[in-house]
Amino acid sequence: FFENFKNMKNAPALVLKTSSATFSVIDRTEIIKKIEGLRRSVDGETPNVYLMHGDLNPEEMNALYNHPKMKAMVSFTKGEGYGRPLAEFARTGKPVLVSNWSGHVDFINPKYHILLPGKLTPVHKSAQSKGMINEGTSWFTVDYAMAGGIMKEVHKNYKKYAEKSRGSGHYMKTEFGL
């Protein structure tokens, strides 16, 4: 994100809704350190990143998804399963850019949204967890260069992609339940 939108006038901002393992102050501080480390690794003026750390209730999530400044959802999910936040956001009728792998491809329709290319790669030993993510398993890794180009294209031609995604709200309401 920093590399793709550095030194850009009117660059988009990133709202990062995440946690590592807990919603503790220590966890939040560690995530901020990672963001700042990435920012320092990029030469040039980097766009803003806003960290949303912690649990939001359904009304708060709905307000976030439908906020007028929230233009799209981007997820480089590695294939963790269903992807309820993706389904919820797709109901807004705003663009979704997401990995072309896992449970969400059942409802993220490329007629409305963008499925990001990539490939299956072995899970690194440091991310393995016995009984959950075992040795020999793979997950999906987005092609970062292509995804970066796609994000820039969506930003540059947002009206086109917003129009394309508009029908997703009706599609999600009539074809899928939450």
Sequence positions of predicted segments:
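Short hydrophobic signal-anchor/transmembrane segments that target glycosyltransferases
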Residues: 1-10, 34, 150
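Nucleotide-activated donor-binding/catalytic signature segment of Leloir-type glycosyltransferases, i.e.
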Residues: 22-67, 71
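A charged, aromatic-enriched C-terminal amphipathic alpha-helix characteristic of glycosyltransferases
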Residues: 138-146, 156-178
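Aromatic "clamp/platform" in nucleotide-sugar-dependent glycosyltransferases that forms part
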Residues: 78
